[in-house]
């Protein structure tokens, strides 16, 4: 998503003096805020929140790479994918990750955004500047998977997920265009959720959201959650996945309108745990919702926060928070990425 420049959140509240009488745990980089006892079963009240990367411009797209036991993530303004390894620290993994053109990019977000692996383990990435989805082969070659719809260029693919049958779903707001919603190069009349079938056929499966952003499946792949990254309508929708892969009209799963006084940010990237809880970035940091849409608690980062990913053994939550990347151990596990059987 695009970086929102808003003043940072006020100083952290003391233990036990938080909104809704919530309990809170503090660290130098973020604090936990429990609003429901179920939150304490997901993240221990004394869990340590650590910083693993800093001095970035706008971190996004965290993805755990089990083959190398490392975390990949995008630094969008710098047009690069970074890698963090617990023993080697932070290194540059892929230069020109989102914009490969010869002419200078005139916007703020040329780089890659969302990252994932396909069912065969190939890195698949949203390339803002090139306005496409690509798969990276073992030799480094980029294979475009989606570049347009009905003869028109995509806006700037933002985030992506595969279902368990190999279909790719991705969001396409205009945040990667130099002038975003008002960019003269914007060709599509909407900002859609798209589906790319295993045979390569692309279809628009949801077009009503102004700024579709982060997305993720429920553990049974029957529901697709999609964030709308707009302050005027900061919601997440839940769509029922139909047998043919299309989506129903959806319902509002959660609404964060009341939380804007508590912190910066809009609905952005999200992940789902094995119990169906949704870990969604939004106002203040990371918001944790039950499968029914009840807000259980928050990880308050004090800065606009873009995305999350589960990694290591599946129970560590990595958080891309503005210029930093954080991690916290959880008591749950993320839904594993689907793999070909």
Ranges and model annotations:
Residues 23-341:
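Sequence-structural signature of mature extracellular/luminal beta-sheet repeat domains
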Residues 8-21:
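Bacterial N-terminal signal peptides
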Residues 1-4:
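Positively charged n-region of N-terminal signal peptides that target proteins for export
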């Amino acid at each position: 998503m695009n970086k929102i420049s808003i003043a940072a959140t006020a100083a952290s509240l003391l233990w036990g003096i938080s909104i809704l009488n919530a309990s809170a745990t503090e660290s130098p980089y973020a604090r936990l805020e429990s609003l429901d006892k179920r939150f304490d079963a997901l993240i221990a009240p004394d869990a340590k929140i650590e910083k693993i990367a800093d001095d970035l411009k706008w971190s996004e797209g965290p993805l755990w790479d089990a083959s190398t036991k490392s975390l990949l993530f995008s630094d969008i303004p710098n047009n690069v994918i970074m890698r963090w390894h617990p023993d080697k620290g932070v290194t540059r993994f892929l230069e020109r990750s989102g914009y490969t053109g010869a002419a200078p990019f005139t916007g703020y977000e040329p780089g890659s955004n969302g990252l994932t692996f396909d069912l065969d383990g190939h890195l698949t990435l949203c390339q803002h500047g090139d306005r496409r989805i690509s798969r990276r082969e073992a030799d480094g070659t980029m294979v475009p998977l989606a570049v347009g719809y009905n003869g028109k260029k995509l806006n700037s693919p933002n985030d992506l997920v595969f279902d368990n049958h190999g279909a790719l779903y991705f969001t396409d707001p205009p945040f990667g265009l130099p002038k975003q919603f008002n960019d003269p190069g914007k060709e599509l009349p909407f900002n859609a959720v798209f589906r790319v079938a295993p045979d390569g056929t692309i279809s628009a499966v949801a077009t009503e959201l102004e700024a579709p952003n982060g997305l993720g499946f429920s553990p049974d792949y029957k529901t697709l959650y999609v964030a709308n990254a707009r302050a005027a309508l900061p919601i997440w929708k839940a769509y029922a996945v139909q047998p043919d892969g299309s989506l129903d009209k959806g319902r509002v799963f959660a609404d964060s309108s009341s939380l804007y006084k508590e912190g910066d940010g809009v609905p952005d990237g999200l992940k789902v745990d094995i119990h169906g809880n949704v870990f969604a970035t939004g106002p203040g940091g990371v918001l944790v919702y039950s499968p029914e849409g009840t807000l259980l608690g928050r990880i308050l980062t004090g800065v606009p926060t873009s995305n999350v990913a589960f990694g290591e053994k599946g129970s560590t939550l990595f958080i891309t928070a503005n210029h930093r990347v954080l991690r916290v151990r959880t008591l749950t596990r993320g839904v594993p990425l689907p793999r070909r059987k």
